[in-house]
């Protein structure tokens, strides 16, 4: 997304708010070999999955009978790097939408096993939509830790425009700012990010039409 905005002429100051680290998953092979569906909510979940697959000394044959569902185009592309095509990609890029599509595939068969690979601090929406209709296992695949870096002094107490791709980005960014600092215009990737922004000193919030980097870039360009 940064490269795309720079190509369009934007002057970008990246601020690193988090560090993604994969989690070593105990008994990984046993957890996934019987899965009917494997679900990823982000590209980081995909990366952690294959990291653990390698640690287990296994390969793709371990999950030969599984089907795959993902949230978002970026997640779909990351999975495709491993020569796997996602079976379900909801048009609305949210966990709630994915839960709805998965439930239509399952019907009344509550013995279907679904493994969700997501962040340790992930939103519960996807789990909530599935826990009553299948054998569900939510696996903490990675953690997004605070990046202890300083905000560039050139930013000062007023940020004219800032782009946020998750609610955790919002919380960590404002934690790094001086107490009296504010953001003039914030661009949000989705509802949860917007809700987090509403709790802080932001004059204007513009939310993308759908939860994708492409839609977020379009929102920024429209404002410009």
Place the predicted regions along the sequence by residue:
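Signature of uroporphyrinogen-III synthase
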Residues: 1-224
């Amino acid at each position: 997304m940064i490269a795309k905005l720079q190509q369009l002429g934007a002057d970008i100051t990246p601020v690193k708010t988090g560090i993604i680290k994969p989690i070593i998953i105990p008994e990984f092979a046993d957890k996934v070999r019987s899965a009917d569906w494997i679900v990823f909510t982000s590209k980081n979940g995909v990366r952690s999955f294959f990291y653990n697959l390698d640690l287990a000394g296994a390969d793709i044959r371990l999950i030969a009978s599984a089907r795959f569902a993902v949230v978002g185009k970026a997640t779909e592309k990351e999975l495709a790097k491993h020569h796997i095509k996602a079976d379900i990609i909801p048009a609305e890029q949210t966990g709630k939408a994915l839960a709805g599509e998965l439930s239509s595939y399952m019907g009344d068969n509550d013995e279907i096993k679904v493994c969700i690979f997501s962040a340790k601090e992930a939103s519960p929406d996807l789990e909530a939509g599935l826990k009553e209709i299948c054998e569900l296992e939510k696996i903490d695949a990675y953690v997004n830790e605070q990046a202890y870096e300083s905000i560039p002094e050139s930013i000062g107490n007023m940020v004219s425009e800032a782009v946020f791709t998750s609610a955790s980005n919002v919380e960590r960014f404002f934690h790094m700012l001086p107490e009296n600092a504010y953001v003039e215009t914030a661009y949000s990737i989705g509802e949860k990010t917007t809700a987090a922004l509403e709790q802080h000193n932001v004059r204007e919030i513009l939310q993308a039409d759908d939860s994708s980097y492409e839609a977020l870039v379009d929102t920024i360009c429209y404002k410009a």
